[in-house]
Amino acid sequence: MAVLSGDEIRKLIQKEGLIRDYVDLETQIQPNGFDCTLRSVYRLRGCGRVDFDNSRRELPELEEVEFRDWVYLPKGVYRAKLNEVVRLGNDIMAIARPRSTLIRCGANVLTAVWDAGYEGRSEVSIVVHNDYGIWLSRNARIIQLVFIRLSSPTKGYEGVYKGENIDS
């Protein structure tokens, strides 16, 4: 396994469509990853349910938080949709980490692993810990995706979130 460099990520974007719908490629490519940006934010309006085999999985209802250029988020938990559509081959996975400025402002981003074979416009959770809240601009860079090449190709992700939000 190896973490992909910014140059390798750029080549995969150009040749294989690793990422599309980005805001500014030169700004978003980093030495060891790619910065993903904020498209929309939602308040959770209910309870979720998680089980072993997803047969009784229920996601909370959402209410979109409207914003033009900026949005103020008071302390709490939110779901956010990213601008970028990621398309991973069966030999690449990704892990996301919050950008350090977000952490220094008292907020964090929670994510799952991007499995090999996943394609979609992902959603993440934003947790605002700061008692005074946080202001986020549309297209704010909130996470850095780190891409890891697997030691060998694997069966690609086929779960319910494959293809999510591509048309939205």
From Swiss-Prot:
Keyword Acetylation: no
CDD domains (UniProt xref): trimeric_dUTPase
Reactions accelerated catalytically: dUTP + H2O = dUMP + diphosphate + H(+)
Ranges in coiled-coil conformation: none
Pathway: Pyrimidine metabolism; dUMP biosynthesis; dUMP from dCTP (dUTP route): step 2/2
EC number(s) per entry: 3.6.1.23
Keywords annotated in UniProt: Hydrolase, Nucleotide metabolism
Stored InterPro entries: dCTP_deaminase, dUTPase-like_sf, dUTPase_archaeal, dUTPase_trimeric
Pfam families in alphabetical order: DCD (PF22769)
Molecular function (Gene Ontology), one example: dUTP diphosphatase activity
Superkingdom: Archaea
An annotated GO BP: dUMP biosynthetic process
Classification via PANTHER family: DCTP DEAMINASE (PTHR42680), DEOXYURIDINE 5'-TRIPHOSPHATE NUCLEOTIDOHYDROLASE (PTHR42680:SF1)
Family: Belongs to the dCTP deaminase family. Archaeal dUTPase subfamily.
Entry function: This enzyme is involved in nucleotide metabolism: it produces dUMP, the immediate precursor of thymidine nucleotides and it decreases the intracellular concentration of dUTP so that uracil cannot be incorporated into DNA.
Descriptive protein name: Probable deoxyuridine 5'-triphosphate nucleotidohydrolase
